[in-house]
Amino acid sequence: MKLDKYTVGKRYGKALFELAVEKNQAEAIYQELLTLREVYHQVPGIGDILSDDRLEPYEKDSIMEKLVTGFSEMMQNFLRVVYEYRRMYDLLLMIDEYERRYDEHQGLILGSVTTAIPLSKEQHQAMEEKAAQLLGYEQAHLVNLIDPSIVGGVVIEANHQVIDGSIRKQLEHMQQKLLK
């Protein structure tokens, strides 16, 4: 059974993170992955090129050697495994998973806070502190999204969890109770 790219991304990202933690290289690998992500953004088709069967193996090997040059031995080995299993087009998903685990390991959660109007700097900071506390993290970084349709209140989304304290949701809940 062929695995979907999200499952592959999670597995490879998790494996790399666990190895990096075991070898006390989590920060260094994280920095290398940020560099690699930048390369992927500068050359968007590189993952597809390295996975393309129409190219001769020696051509892909040459590109691959240029790509891994300058990275640590662990990162080079990881990239070679990903390349050998023809998963270079899934690399950004692997990086995302590693980054999620790295942030979690650091006690940091990333997410969003949706409000009807923009938050002030003080409100935004207070919201991040409250979200971190509610979700059990040391700190949170939340992007403020604006959606006037929530009427008021806030909706916090982080780590596949949603805390909906919007006026819209409260009104919907009251409407359901009244209709019963």
Curated annotation (Swiss-Prot):
Recorded hits in Pfam families, A to Z, give:
OSCP
| Gene3D superfamilies to which the protein is assigned, alphabetical | N-terminal domain of the delta subunit of the F1F0-ATP synthase
The UniProt entry, under SUPFAM superfamilies, shows: N-terminal domain of the delta subunit of the F1F0-ATP synthase
Which membrane topology term applies here? Peripheral membrane protein
The GO terms describing molecular function are: proton-transporting ATP synthase activity, rotational mechanism
Instruction: Give the top-rank taxon of the lineage listed in the UniProt record for this protein.
Output: Bacteria
| Signal peptide feature range | none
* Subcellular location(s) per record: Cell membrane
Transmembrane intervals = none
Q: Does the keyword Ion transport apply?
A: yes
Q: Primary place of residence? A: membrane
Q: What are the annotated GO cellular component locations?
A: plasma membrane; proton-transporting ATP synthase complex
**Keywords attached to this entry:** ATP synthesis, Cell membrane, CF(1), Hydrogen ion transport, Ion transport, Membrane, Transport
Q: What does this protein do?
A: F(1)F(0) ATP synthase produces ATP from ADP in the presence of a proton or sodium gradient. F-type ATPases consist of two structural domains, F(1) containing the extramembraneous catalytic core and F(0) containing the membrane proton channel, linked together by a central stalk and a peripheral stalk. During catalysis, ATP synthesis in the catalytic domain of F(1) is coupled via a rotary mechanism of the central stalk subunits to proton translocation. This protein is part of the stalk that links CF(0) to CF(1). It either transmits conformational changes from CF(0) to CF(1) or is implicated in proton conduction.
The entry's family comment says: Belongs to the ATPase delta chain family.
Q: How does it assemble?
A: F-type ATPases have 2 components, F(1) - the catalytic core - and F(0) - the membrane proton channel. F(1) has five subunits: alpha(3), beta(3), gamma(1), delta(1), epsilon(1). F(0) has three main subunits: a(1), b(2) and c(10-14). The alpha and beta chains form an alternating ring which encloses part of the gamma chain. F(1) is attached to F(0) by a central stalk formed by the gamma and epsilon chains, while a peripheral stalk is formed by the delta and b chains.
Q: HAMAP family from the entry?
A: ATP_synth_delta_bact
Q: What is this protein called?
A: ATP synthase subunit delta
Q: Which organism is it from?
A: Enterococcus faecalis (strain ATCC 700802 / V583)
Q: Identify the coding gene.
A: atpH
